Design a protein with these regions (language model features):
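Conserved CoA-thioester-binding segment of acyl-CoA-metabolizing enzymes
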Residues: 2-58, 74
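Hydrophobic/aromatic residues within transmembrane alpha-helices
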Residues: 18, 55, 67, 118-120, ...
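Short, flexible helix/strand-to-coil boundary loops that buttress conserved ligand/catalytic motifs
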Residues: 29-30, 66, 75, 137, ...
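An acidic, glycine-rich surface segment that forms the CoA-thioester-binding/catalytic face
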Residues: 34-38, 42, 46, 68-108
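Short, Asp-centered acidic motifs that coordinate Mg2+ and/or phosphate
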Residues: 52-54, 78-79, 104, 124
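Short, active-site-adjacent cap segments at secondary-structure transitions
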Residues: 60-64, 69, 112, 134
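Crotonase-fold acyl-CoA enzyme core
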Residues: 94-175
Length: 176
C-alpha cells in the first residue's frame, strides 16, 4: 500500500538496528510488518559486515504484539503453513527464525503479547526503567502463537512464566 514501511533498518558499522515504527498501532505487528521484520533479519543474517542486531520500538513502545485489528479486518493475511525446512515468517515476523548472530531487544514501554515473544526471541534484552512485559493476550483469549509459551519458561523459569501466562499480569522492569 501507500503507507510508509513500518520497519526501518539503520546500519552503523557492525550494528544493525531494526526499528518498529507504527505509532498509530503502538508498534503492533500486522502482516506487512511481520514480512518486513522477517526480511530485515534475513538481510542482517546474510550481511557479512553486520555482527549484531538491535530490535527497537519507536515512540516509547517496544511492541504491543500482533495487530488484532489488522488480523480481524484483513483478507490479505494468509495463514502461514511453514513447509518443513523453509523458514517462513511467523505471525510476528522473525520469531521462528534461527539466526547465526545475536539480536538484542532494546525494550522501552510495552512489550506485551507478541511483543513479549519478539523480546524473548532475541538473545539479550535490555530494559529501560519504564518497560512493562506482559502476556496480555491472555485477557483477550488469544494464545501465544509463535513459540512464546515455549521460550518464556526456558528464559525466566517455569513458575514465573506460568504466573505471567496464566494471570496476564504486567511485570515492571525492576522485577523483570
Amino acid at each position: 500500500g501507500g503507507e510508509m514501511s513500518s520497519v526501518r533498518v539503520e546500519k552503523n558499522g557492525a550494528v544493525t538496528t531494526v526499528i518498529l515504527d507504527r505509532p498509530h498501532a503502538r508498534n503492533a505487528v500486522d502482516g506487512p510488518t511481520a514480512m518486513a521484520l522477517f526480511e530485515a533479519f534475513t538481510e542482517f543474517d546474510a550481511d557479512e559486515s553486520a555482527s549484531v542486531a538491535v530490535l527497537w520500538g519507536e515512540h516509547g513502545t517496544f511492541c504491543a504484539g500482533a495487530d488484532l485489528k489488522a488480523i480481524g479486518t484483513s483478507d490479505s493475511n494468509p495463514v502461514h503453513r511453514p513447509r518443513v525446512g523453509v523458514t517462513a515468517p511467523g505471525p510476528m515476523g522473525p520469531s521462528r527464525m534461527v539466526l547465526s548472530k545475536p539480536v538484542i531487544a532494546a525494550v522501552s514501554g510495552y512489550a506485551v503479547a507478541g511483543g513479549l515473544e519478539l523480546a524473548v526471541w532475541c538473545d539479550l534484552r535490555v530494559a529501560e526503567e519504564d518497560a512493562v512485559f506482559g502476556v496480555f493476550c491472555r485477557r483477550w483469549g488469544v494464545p501465544l502463537i509463535d513459540g512464546g509459551t515455549v521460550r518464556l519458561p526456558r528464559l525466566i523459569g517455569h513458575g514465573r512464566a506460568m504466573d505471567m501466562i496464566l494471570t496476564g499480569r504486567a511485570v515492571a522492569a525492576d522485577e523483570a
